[in-house]
Curated annotation (Swiss-Prot):
GO terms for cellular component: cytoplasm. Disulfide bonds join 106-338. It comes from Prochlorococcus marinus subsp. pastoris (strain CCMP1986 / NIES-2087 / MED4). Its cofactor is [4Fe-4S] cluster. Residues 99-323 form the Radical SAM core domain. This is Probable dual-specificity RNA methyltransferase RlmN. [4Fe-4S] cluster binds at residues 113, 117, 120.
Length: 348
């Protein structure tokens, strides 16, 4: 089966020409595929195409999408989690997060995750496989269709480690930027940090995208190596100081600041001495710390840092000259928040 989702306008023009059609037929497919207001769900719906051409595309197994909707969960704050099934009977989750002026799509890059971070539900079932470009992009279509709103922002913070699927990730970003008309500056890629991959991300971004303007978010979650190894098993292979050094180089190469994600775990990493340690670790280059509230999962007994303690931690960082904010949790009552995505209700 050949998926049209992810094809550029030139790709679609070439397909049209290969079937004896004029190039503008490819542009018509492109418009019906990516234009939010005119989007169709199947080849049959593109009634501006000749019937013969539509039949040819269907007979050659051309598709508009890869996924099917299994379940949807609406949180009290309007956050929508979708459980989607792949063609090989795996399951993946994505989340639509609405605010007054925008709709953020939280996308998955893999089915499951190999990193096994102790505070995250996704890694509890391990990695099944990486997602294809069409499967990543199809999540956007489902969110827009279910929420009747165009996606304005993208965060690769769903299931999986994006840098372990870097080729499909960058092709997806290119399509999101060029075909879905979402600026790179409205895209965030979150990674637990893989050895040598931060520099590779910078290098390949310039090769594939021509520029590197999306936000890189490092799931740091600790102020020292000992704590990080205790909650992130893969940290044993990549020392925290080496991560920061690679981030400094990334900023020099791209001109883009790095965001450090810091999940606050009560009694683990939330003391003021940890704030001081963190500020000393990351000071002196263009970065931002995003403090995150812990969202409960069944398998572990971590506790949320009390709000008062979190505010003191934030103030301590700010007083040290660190750019810092506190991310409000969304969708936790339907297990749609950070760290709660998994392969729920998988079809057997």
């Amino acid at each position: 089966m050949k998926n049209l989702l992810g094809c550029s306008v030139k790709d679609l023009e070439k397909i049209a020409l290969n079937y004896g059609q004029a190039a503008f037929r490819g542009r018509q497919i492109y418009n019906w595929l990516y234009n939010y207001k005119n989007r169709s769900k199947s080849i049959d719906e593109i009634n501006v195409l000749p019937l013969k051409f539509r039949d040819q595309l269907k007979n050659e197994a051309f598709l508009f999408g890869e996924l099917t909707l299994k379940e949807k969960y609406l949180a009290t704050d309007g956050t929508l989690k979708l459980l989607l099934n792949t063609r090989d009977n795996e399951s993946v989750e994505c989340v639509g997060i609405p605010t007054e002026k925008r709709l953020t799509a939280c996308l998955s890059s893999q089915v499951g995750c190999p990193m096994d971070c102790k505070f995250c539900a996704t890694g509890k079932e391990g990695l099944k496989r990486s997602l294809k470009v069409s499967e990543i992009l199809d999540q956007i279509l489902f969110i827009e269709n279910q929420m009747n709103q165009k996606v304005s922002n993208i965060v690769f913070m769903g299931m999986g480690e994006p840098l372990l699927n870097i080729d499909e990730l960058l092709l997806s970003i290119r399509s999101i930027n060029e075909d879905f008309a979402i600026s790179q500056r409205k895209i965030t890629v979150s990674t637990v940090a893989i050895p040598k991959m931060i520099s590779k991300l910078s290098e390949l971004s310039f090769q594939v995208l021509g520029k590197c303007q999306f936000t890189l978010a490092i799931s740091l979650h600790a102020s020292n190596q000992k704590i990080r190894e205790a909650i992130i098993p893969s940290a044993k292979n990549y020392h925290i100081k080496n991560i920061i050094d690679d981030c400094r180089e990334y900023v020099r190469e791209t001109g883009r600041r790095v965001s450090f994600e810091y999940l606050m775990l009560h009694g683990v990493n939330d003391k003021l001495e940890h704030a001081d340690e963190l500020s000393n670790l990351i000071k002196g280059f263009q970065c931002h710390v995003n403090l995150i509230q812990y969202n409960h999962i069944e398998e572990v007994e971590f506790k949320q840092t009390p709000i008062k303690n979190a505010q003191l931690f934030q103030t301590r960082l700010s007083n040290s000259g660190i750019n810092v904010s506190f991310r409000k949790s969304r969708g936790s009552d339907r297990n749609a928040a950070c760290g709660q995505l998994r392969q729920n209700d998988k079809i057997k």
